[in-house]
Amino acid sequence: MYRDWLMRGKSQNKLRLFVQAAFCALSNGYVLGFSRKEIFEGATKYICAPGLNCYSCPAAVFSCPIGSLQAVLSSRDYKISLYVIGLLTVFGVFLGRAVCGFLCPFGLLQDLLFKIPFAKKIRRLPKDGALRYLRFFILGVFVILLPLFVVDITGLGEPWFCKWICPAGTLGGGIPLVLLNSAMRGAAGFIFRWKIVILALTLLLSVVIYRPFCRYVCPLGAIYGVFNKISFYRFKVDEEKCTKCGACQKTCKLDIPVWRNPNSADCIRCGECKAICPHSAISVGI
């Protein structure tokens, strides 16, 4: 019977990987951008992708929701701000952090890196509980407050998260543009090198610990996590079937006690707990 549960978990992983890869390809369909050394500026760029996908990636056909939110907050265009916030709310209400589990290209990259064999994988970092609040701090300070209140003489702010932190932007936008554009290579300075360090640390940690960026840093995950308890797509635990055996938490790479908190703000809805539950106590509720 355990083998059956294990096979169900593997099938769930394959399905999720297929959806992730398909959406990553859809979000980055302008492959000519690399050969033409340009950023796509078609009509779809007015639409935000649900996951973290850099606007400046030459292949990207959608905008990044976090980049867009910073841009509109710093520009004082509140009508567009309401559009971006409304779009994030729609994604959150319907899917919650299922966006992170199925529709985020940078999440896919971390999933693939974690599959690389390593001598000792880590379940959590020291002070894990406190570190999980870091993404809310980054959301509040770097995505909202700094772009809104730290402005130049014209009243415009900067995209602080994109400029100083975002490893997805460095990988998808910064590195390709610097490699493809000689003028940008000459202009790349301290900030670019700083972000290379952040990217390198994120990628290396992703081999050892599951989704460190999503778990501790991502402000988009912080937004969607708030919706997990109220989103249409959420998990339910049948208390009559559940024996609190802990199989769900043991299989959860984010170390969530699903039996106690099935709609944790940390849950990315990968579905492995549901597939592995020996009592079929976990279900998807709408």
Question: Where are the language model's segments positioned?
Answer:
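Non-ligating segments of multi-cofactor redox enzymes
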Residues: 1-255, 265-286
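Donor-sugar nucleotide-binding helix/loop cap in glycosyltransferases
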Residues: 260
